[in-house]
């Protein structure tokens, strides 16, 4: 079984929507009065579909054909108004619409190649919306503590393992493995990640026309510290 096909098939089992995520999104949409959202790196559409349930018009995009296919099937099954299509966050030129908000959640942003591409991507985001919500792993903690392994995720059907390999060029190899309980089959894959520290992210946001309006360490809205599991940032486009 191909790793990324397996990951897309079991993504919702591995990463189910949790109460704090749902509440955070609802509060954010209400506070910023969003009526439309572009969800970049939407995965299997979990956040996009939840956002559409609030009455917001949502387009979810992802680089994975499998993820987009699953998202469309989920939306159709439950009658969601969310729509989905293929797109790479590095090139949003085919998306002609503008939105109130842009979401880039689930550590999608860390797939840029470095500072230059980060700046290019955040600049593109500013052409698509006036409000921005970002979420990544807290790489300040990962780098400071040289964290090499994230907690494994165990479900009724599988165990999901995640390890980091620190590279000399400052990037991370993110090594993932899924072990299926019944068949004992194991599939694995590796992604190259740019570990974006929070100061770098905030500096680049400012350089690309964004003003940070909120920062948290998780979707429970706990204050961000170097020990936080995640970095969640909200920003507003600075009027020109």
Residue ranges and their predicted role:
Residues 200-240:
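C-terminal lobe and adjacent flexible extensions of AdoMet/dcAdoMet transferase-like proteins
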Residues 100-116:
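A short SAM/SAH-binding and catalytic strip from SAM-dependent methyltransferases
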Residues 45-91:
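Class I SAM-dependent methyltransferase SAM/SAH-binding core
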Residues 133-204:
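SAM-dependent methyltransferase
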Residues 117-131:
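A short glycine-rich, Lys/Arg-flanked "PGG" loop and its adjoining helix->strand segment in the class I
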Residues 91-97:
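Short conserved loop adjoining the S-adenosyl-L-methionine
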Residues 1-32, 34-43:
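Conserved class I S-adenosyl-L-methionine
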């Amino acid at each position: 079984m191909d790793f990324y096909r397996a990951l897309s098939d079991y993504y919702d089992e591995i990463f189910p929507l949790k109460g704090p995520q749902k509440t955070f999104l609802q509060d954010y949409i209400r506070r910023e009065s969003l009526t439309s959202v572009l969800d970049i790196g939407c995965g299997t559409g979990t956040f996009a579909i939840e956002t559409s349930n609030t009455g917001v018009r949502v387009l979810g995009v992802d680089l994975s054909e499998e993820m987009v296919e699953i998202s469309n099937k989920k939306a159709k099954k439950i009658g969601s108004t969310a729509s989905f299509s293929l797109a790479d966050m590095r090139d949003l030129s085919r998306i002609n619409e503008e939105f109130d908000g842009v979401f880039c959640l689930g550590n999608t942003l860390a797939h840029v190649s470095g500072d230059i591409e980060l700046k290019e991507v955040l600049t593109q985001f500013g052409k698509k919306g006036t409000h921005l919500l970002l979420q990544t792993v807290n790489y300040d903690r990962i780098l400071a503590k040289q964290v090499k392994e994230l907690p494994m995720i165990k479900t009724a059907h599988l165990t999901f393992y995640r390890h980091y390999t620190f590279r000399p060029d400052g990037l991370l190899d993110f090594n993932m493995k899924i072990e299926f309980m019944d068949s004992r089959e194991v599939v694995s894959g590796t992604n190259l990640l740019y570990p974006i520290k929070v100061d770098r992210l905030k500096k680049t946001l400012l350089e690309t026309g964004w003003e940070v309006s909120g920062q948290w360490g998780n979707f429970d809205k706990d204050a961000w510290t170097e020990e936080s599991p995640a970095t969640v940032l909200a920003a507003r486009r600075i009027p020109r």
